Amino acid sequence: AMNDSTIYGVCGEGTSMHNLELISDGGDTLSVFIDDENPDVVQGGLLAGDRIALIGYKAEDGEMMAQKIINLTSLLGKWTSLDKNFDILEGGEVKNNVKAETNPWTSWKILNGKLLLNKDTFAIDKLGSDSLMLENTQGIFVFKRQE
């Protein structure tokens, strides 16, 4: 199995536009620099208390830098497209709402900054309040959030 370089935790109160304060699942409080010249770094926004998946690296000066930040709290919920209708649930479960679906997604996880749905690997191009854009070799898939 591939090693997952993702750090999981909760977004801290000290988070700002250029700095993620991450209280990791291991109990450490990390301060991570966010370069806002690349708007794709943060997906799903940053709200204190939200669950976060971080892909980071150490800069030469030792500072922790964010390569990708995925707000897992924002990822949860009901998403629909023309042919898909599914709920991303806490704990890695996907609930499929299309009866005729032949190969439904039943599980999800983050691996090295990518979203795995069953065995399908997607880059998260955009995670907004009402839309989710996933990309893989087969193309770009856009989903809308349903309340």
Regions found by a protein language model. Give the residues of each.
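Solvent-exposed coil/turn segments that connect beta secondary-structure elements
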Residues: 25-27, 37, 57-59, 113, ...
